[in-house]
Amino acid sequence: MKILIAEDDLASRKFMHKFFSEYGECDLVVDGLEAIEAYMMSIKEEEPYDLICLDIMMPKVDGIKVLKAIKELEEKNNVLLANRAKIIMTTALGETELVKEAFELGSDAYASKPIDLKKIKQVMEKLSLIG
């Protein structure tokens, strides 16, 4: 499985990397602009991500705008529905409006911080990423 972790907080990024690396190859980015660039590169190289873990509050470009960009790139590049990355939005905020917007834009799941690994594993099972 190919995984993109977009997280600006170093401790959270390391924590998520340690967990997700058990399931596949992880690329790490620290801001929204890098996330968009990494996604574009994965499409160009025809090695799309299976999972994107995307922080809502990031520098340069926030997670909501990154999500919009990913969905637009999927449409533009005619990425088949079955091949589209599963997206888990994360945030330490209790911003229900942002979470609602993320789901409306096509996020597959949401995880609040601090990340509960048991819940993330359940989400991955629900999304058919792991058995």
Please tell me what each predicted stretch does:
Residues 21, 28-41, 63:
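Helix N-cap/capping motif at the beta->alpha junctions
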Residues 58:
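Receiver (REC) domain active-site loop signature in two-component systems and cognate sites
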